[in-house]
Regions:
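Amide-forming acyltransferase catalytic core, primarily the GNAT-like/NAT-type
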Residues: 3-6, 11-54, 59, 132-274
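An N-terminal, globular interaction/scaffold subdomain
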Residues: 28-30, 42, 48, 62-65, ...
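Active-site-proximal structural scaffolding
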Residues: 45, 74, 96, 113-117, ...
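Basic, Lys/Arg-rich alpha-helical nucleic-acid-recognition elements, primarily the DNA-binding modules
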Residues: 63, 80-84, 103
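Active-site/acyl-donor-binding loops of N-acyltransferases
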Residues: 66, 110-166, 228-230, 239-249, ...
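Short, basic, glycine/proline-bearing loop/turn elements
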Residues: 83-88, 283-284
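Conserved acetyl-CoA-binding loop-helix of GNAT-fold acetyltransferases
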Residues: 86, 91-106, 289-301
């Protein structure tokens, strides 16, 4: 068995190679690799991916996403675990351990983990290199009936109820849509407009909202990169996407980049991610004054596009949405888990939902 590692240049060469094109399974999709290559926080020497091969057969891989955090007044390079997969046929051959310890040897003191399978939490913590798992509490508001997805599709023994459940969802959502026609029109005090120009004024804005310490650093280039190099492409699964274990295509995927203006002055920013009718507030930079108008904007977008849920980890926004009780069906508390190296003094409370690779998935 052979483990290959790839930095930025090597990753570019790999995805253009005949070897990559001939693999039955690939360790990274082409467009996801391009995103890694263009990451503004990625240095030429950063190892981004480790892949294990048995002859010409891919049997496992692990990858990271470089980032920058500010802790104790110092910018520090960090690496978010972004993918980890081992072929079922090789899970008894220590492939996972070989891959993960290749990663640990290089980035032990700078590794961050989020969006992990709960069953792996104890395994990570047994290494003794991480702070106790931290959690951020968020809120999810279901805005359409989706019993089929929430219950039937997840519980195999209830699959016989799927046709009836789909019919019920469609009928109830039709009723809910008709009711929405009679909603009272809102009046916004601020101007919120879609804009993906990340210039010097934008940089000044987000700098004013980022804390002086204990946060994941972002600048204009990061947001341009996120929108320019998505990990998920909109469309049906194809031959290429079936070669990759993780998601690379989705029936609906896109971003909505919104700037907030008060008296023609840029005063806030919000980045929304929409995937398969689910809206997530990935980044939010604004004062309390704008929260009411932002909630109106989000709820109007949900109504116009018939989206099924809203997820936010900004308590101010969640509290404002909660006031509009007739605009959603069920509220639910959700949590996001973070495992952070002991070597960097940072807490999860400074993270935004989109930090790490969440904004891409």
């Amino acid at each position: 068995m052979q483990i290959e590692s790839y930095n930025r240049q090597q990753l570019q060469e790999f995805i253009e190679s005949d070897f990559y094109k001939k693999l039955d399974n690939i360790p990274v999709s082409y467009h996801r690799a391009l995103s890694h290559i263009h990451n503004p926080d990625c240095a030429a020497e950063d190892t981004l991916l480790w892949a294990a091969y048995e002859d010409d057969l891919l049997v496992g891989y692990v990858g990271v996403l470089p980032g920058i955090c500010r802790a104790k007044g110092i910018d520090k390079k960090i690496y978010w675990l972004s993918c980890f997969w081992v072929d079922e046929s090789y899970r008894k051959q220590q492939v996972a351990s070989l891959l993960f310890f290749s990663l640990i040897r290089e980035y032990e003191e700078r590794l961050f983990i989020s969006n992990f399978i709960p069953a792996l939490e104890k395994t990570y913590q047994r290494l003794g290199i991480f702070q106790p798992t931290a959690y951020r509490i968020g809120y999810r508001f279901y805005t359409r009936f989706c019993f089929t997805e929430i219950l039937i599709s997840r519980i195999s023994r209830m699959s016989f109820l799927k046709p009836a459940s789909i019919l019920a969802d469609n009928f109830l959502n039709l009723f809910f849509s008709v009711r929405a026609l009679f909603y009272k029109k809102w009046k916004k005090n601020l101007n919120i407009m879609e804009d993906s120009c990340f210039d010097e004024k934008f940089q000044i804005l987000i700098d004013s909202f980022q804390p002086k310490d204990n946060y994941i650093r972002k600048d204009s280039g990061h947001f341009d990169w996120i929108l320019s190099y998505p990990w998920i492409l909109q469309g049906k699964p194809d031959k290429e996407s079936r070669r990759y274990f993780f998601s690379s295509r989705s029936s609906q995927f896109g971003y909505c980049s919104l700037k907030i203006y008060e008296n023609q002055h840029l005063s806030g920013y919000i980045l929304l991610k929409i995937r398969d009718k689910a809206l997530t507030v990935s980044y939010l930079y604004t004062s309390d004054v704008a929260i009411k108008d932002i909630a109106i904007c989000v709820l109007e977008k949900v109504r116009e596009e018939k989206l099924k849920m809203i997820t936010t980890f900004d308590k101010r926004l969640a509290d404002e949405i909660r006031k509009n009780r007739n605009r959603y069906l069920i509220p639910k508390e959700v949590k996001q888990s973070y495992i952070v190296t002991k070597e960097i003094d940072i807490t999860s409370f400074s993270f935004q939902e989109g930090d790490g690779d969440s904004v891409f998935t």
